[in-house]
Amino acid sequence: MNVAVHLVNPIPAAEQSMVQCGNVKLATYRWGNPNGPTLLLVHGYPDNHEIWLPLINQLATDFQIIAYDVRGAGASDKPQHRRDYRLPLLADDLQAVILAHSPNQPVHLIAHDWGSIQSWEGVTEPRLQKHLASYTSVSGPCLDHVGYWMSRKRPWRQVLGQLLSSWYIAFFHLPFIPQLAWRHGMAKLWPRFLRQVEGIRPVRVSRTQSEDGQHGVKLYRANFIRSLLTPRQRHTQVPVQLVVLTRDRFVKAHLFDDLPRWAPKLWRREVAAGHWQLLAEPSQLAQWVREFVALQEAGENCAALQKAQVHHQNL
């Protein structure tokens, strides 16, 4: 998706480069203040790095910002095999981008949807945690955490509600049909879907929308069943800012109820917004990012963050 917005102070064109990770080349983009803290943005499905442009416009004055097209999206390579989209390889991609652009300073990671899902793999990987100053996760849980969540006794309404919200996951596991849908019209219908379901205007089709949709379904096929049926214990000591969208039609808030078990340094923010709304209208997210980075960089703990912090007695 490409959210077409009128930028009050348009940002300069990004500095583009390619980062090699194994056999895959990743397209990376750099904006902003090279002397500021580094933000690393990871997009979801079926998007590419362009989804972040409204947020980048609000933050580029004070931060160095790096974004990349994940494998299978945008200008990055698009491996053909499902096995090439497994979570450990996606964590390797994250590490490669960090080492290419900020090898000596930890980055503040911000991710949405599938970008958040795959970033959890890196955030919970011991070898990567030293490279991460913080993690802001928007509407994308760790699949292993979800696997443990589902294995515990839950109110049937919660489980049924999440299953109904996740109908698209079953669709993406069907052979051939999802790719054919993206190839033959779904890309052109995508802006209408976002207008009607999310209320987002205006939206235009990205030039790589069809390919992004076709290749991105491999993310689901390579990881969902494996992670949900045989979840791993994935812990992190990285400070996590969890952004819960209470009007999200696809990811329900109760999926994150057990997160303090896995991420003890946790702040939880809630906002009445749909799945893509905070990226299209990013003022609130930009403010939260500024506050969270200021806390980690300078110890500036505002009242809103004090309220959002999840303390052990709340577990």
Tell what function each PLM region has:
Residues 2-14, 24, 47, 51, ...:
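Flexible "cap/lid" subdomain of the alpha/beta-hydrolase fold that forms the substrate-access gate
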Residues 44, 113, 280-281:
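Active-site helix-initiating loop/hinge in glycosyltransferases
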